[in-house]
Amino acid sequence: GPVAVTFVMDDERLGKYRDRKFTFNGEKRVFHMEAAENAKPADLVIVAVKYNGLESAIDTMSTSVGEDTVIMSVMNGIDSEKKIAARYGWGHTIDAIAQGMDAMRFGDDLTCTHRGQLCIGMEREEQRENLEKVVRFFQEIHMPYTEESDILHRMWAKFMMNVGVNQACAAFETDYAGTLEEGSDANRIMLAAMREVIALANSEGIGLT
């Protein structure tokens, strides 16, 4: 229920969001929010911020991380886990990526028809116990998820798609369908950007093709 989830933030953000009214698919939602200085260690910390807010979030969540806390980033990209592990250790983390959702936000209103799922896994043996804990928890709450045998490949594959599609859409002011038009400049740029990610992934030992 709502009391089982707390949004932890700094004082500035708490003042900004505390009295706002939020809706999900037209239904009012009330979220429990707390200043970081008052937070207690949590069983699971979910990191869901924009990339330029990651370093600040790593500091802000320090009071929420205890001896047995599992930290799960659901951010796009391929290095948020490394940044979190550099501060708190791989023994606190699992790897995760969100996919399949079509959520759109308009101010404080969120809409979606497909909620998607979380792809979760581990890249180091010291993450195994954390992964098992999260799997049991997701099963208990009926959270849609897939346990990936090669989570790094999954993360790099989504990164490749995001880089290719987002760059092409921004450069040519088109949508996803526009990037798929064979022979178009948007399609050419999308594929070129994806090939750059493939080369980078291969250099990191990820068999992306």
At which residue positions do the language-model features occur?
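Residues at the C-termini of beta-strands that transition into short coil/loop
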Residues: 9-11, 37-39, 75, 97, ...
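Conserved N-terminal Rossmann-fold NAD(P) cofactor-binding segment
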Residues: 2-42
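Rossmann-like NAD(P)(H) cofactor-binding subdomain of soluble oxidoreductases
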Residues: 25-109
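Active-site-adjacent beta-strand anchor residues
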Residues: 7-8, 47-48, 74, 121, ...
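Positions that flank functional sites
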Residues: 13, 100, 153
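Internal alpha-helical scaffold of NAD(P)-dependent oxidoreductase catalytic cores
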Residues: 16, 63-64, 87-92, 107, ...
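Short phosphate-engaging motifs
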Residues: 13, 53-54, 80, 126-130
